């Protein structure tokens, strides 16, 4: 009886951990796991293992955490594992051409967008910011470019009007696992998968999210600000200044109603929301958070804080206290 295909898995965050868990539940032989080195986390800045590492330890899988795969030592170590196929999901390290050539069946990547749209590090957030109606998963054969390889399989996910980066992430992680499990048998059996070359004319990129992008610019339309709130939940969380303090906005709704007021002006305060004037329309804040406090509904916030219509919320962080 032939030995089962030797799969090497590389991934780091929860997205990848969900996919690894599903592979193990499907009884695939994971010969080794690669994940990023432990990172300082929390107030104590203690080294914290990745979610993928936790699963590897639980299942007693051989585990490797190189800081890079560009040096010959790391490449030789990986080659010695003799993988038939390498599955990559949100690993976070660049795989040099030398590494891509090691598995005879190649390296495949589970990417959280419908390629060639949103190549890069933050496809979920960029799709929400752009107001995309549909996103999805692409299973692609990796090459030397940034998410440029031929696409083996896709699965679509319609974005709900109330979806956040958190909810889309969870949906795509499960969808990615399902998509991978659908095409993996034919990849391992060397059957002819129809890999589609990407249309370069349709390519766009999803650069990593920067913290400063979280500041709400009230001169923008309410629709765009609502997208920003959804795209930056759970990180870095949309925020503004109120009374010289930083207020994080976890949930909001764009309203068509307009007001003859300076963008950022607090228009109305009621139990269902805090209405703020924007460059076009009104943004109703629904869930907020002050520094050092829990996330709360506007009603809970107003039980402890008094707000007066007419004050102006500002974008410039200045000397605002960080959450």
UniProtKB/Swiss-Prot annotation:
From the UniProt record, which GO molecular function terms apply? methionyl-tRNA formyltransferase activity
Q: Which Pfam families match?
A: Formyl_trans_C, Formyl_trans_N
An example Gene Ontology cellular component term from the record? Answer: cytosol
Asked if Protein biosynthesis is a keyword of the record, the answer is: yes
Catalytic activity reads: L-methionyl-tRNA(fMet) + (6R)-10-formyltetrahydrofolate = N-formyl-L-methionyl-tRNA(fMet) + (6S)-5,6,7,8-tetrahydrofolate + H(+)
Output the SUPFAM superfamilies linked to this UniProt entry: FMT C-terminal domain-like (SSF50486), Formyltransferase (SSF53328)
CDD domains, alphabetized: FMT_core_Met-tRNA-FMT_N, Met_tRNA_FMT_C
Q: Where does (6S)-5,6,7,8-tetrahydrofolate bind?
A: 113-116
Q: Establish whether keyword Protein biosynthesis is in the entry.
A: yes
Which InterPro entries does the UniProt record give? Fmt, Formyl_trans_C, Formyl_trans_C_sf, Formyl_transf_N, Formyl_transf_N_sf, Formyl_transferase-like_C_sf, GART_AS, Met-tRNA-FMT_C
What are the record keywords, sorted?
Protein biosynthesis, Transferase
Q: List the EC numbers from the record.
A: 2.1.2.9
Which family does this protein fall into? Belongs to the Fmt family.
| NCBIfam families in the cross-refs | fmt
Task: Give the function comment from the record.
Answer: Attaches a formyl group to the free amino group of methionyl-tRNA(fMet). The formyl group appears to play a dual role in the initiator identity of N-formylmethionyl-tRNA by promoting its recognition by IF2 and preventing the misappropriation of this tRNA by the elongation apparatus.
Recorded hits in HAMAP family, A to Z, give:
Formyl_trans
Protein name as catalogued: Methionyl-tRNA formyltransferase
Protein's organism: Nitrosococcus oceani (strain ATCC 19707 / BCRC 17464 / JCM 30415 / NCIMB 11848 / C-107)
């Amino acid at each position: 009886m032939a030995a089962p295909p030797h799969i090497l898995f590389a991934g780091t965050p929860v997205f990848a951990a969900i996919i690894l868990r599903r592979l193990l539940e499907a009884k695939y032989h994971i010969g080794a796991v690669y994940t990023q080195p432990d990172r300082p986390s929390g107030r104590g800045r203690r080294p914290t293992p990745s979610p993928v590492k936790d699963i590897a330890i639980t299942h007693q899988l051989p585990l490797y955490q190189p800081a890079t795969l560009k040096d010959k030592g790391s490449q030789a170590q990986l080659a010695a594992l003799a993988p038939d196929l390498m599955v990559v999901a949100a690993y976070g390290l660049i795989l040099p051409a030398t590494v891509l050539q090691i598995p005879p069946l190649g390296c495949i990547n589970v990417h959280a967008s419908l390629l060639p749209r949103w190549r890069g590090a933050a496809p979920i957030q960029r799709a929400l910011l752009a107001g995309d109606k549909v996103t999805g998963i692409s299973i692609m054969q990796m090459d030397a470019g940034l998410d440029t390889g031929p696409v083996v399989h896709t699965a679509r996910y319609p974005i709900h009007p109330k979806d956040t980066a958190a909810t889309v992430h969870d949906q795509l992680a499960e969808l990615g696992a399902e998509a991978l499990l659908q095409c993996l048998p034919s990849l391992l059996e060397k059957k002819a998968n129809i890999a589609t070359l990407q249309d370069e004319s349709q390519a766009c990129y999803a650069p990593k999210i920067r913290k400063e992008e979280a500041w709400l610019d009230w001169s923008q339309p309410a629709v765009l600000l609502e997208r920003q709130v959804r795209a930056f939940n759970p990180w870095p969380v949309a925020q503004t200044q109120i009374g010289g303090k930083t207020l994080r906005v976890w949930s909001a709704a764009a309203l068509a109603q307009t007001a003859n007021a300076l963008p950022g002006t607090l228009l109305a305060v009621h139990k269902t929301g805090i209405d703020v004037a924007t460059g076009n329309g009104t943004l109703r804040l629904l869930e907020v958070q002050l520094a050092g406090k829990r996330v709360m509904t506007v009603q809970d916030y107003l039980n402890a804080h008094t707000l007066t219509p007419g004050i102006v919320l500002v974008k410039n962080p200045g000397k605002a206290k960080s959450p």
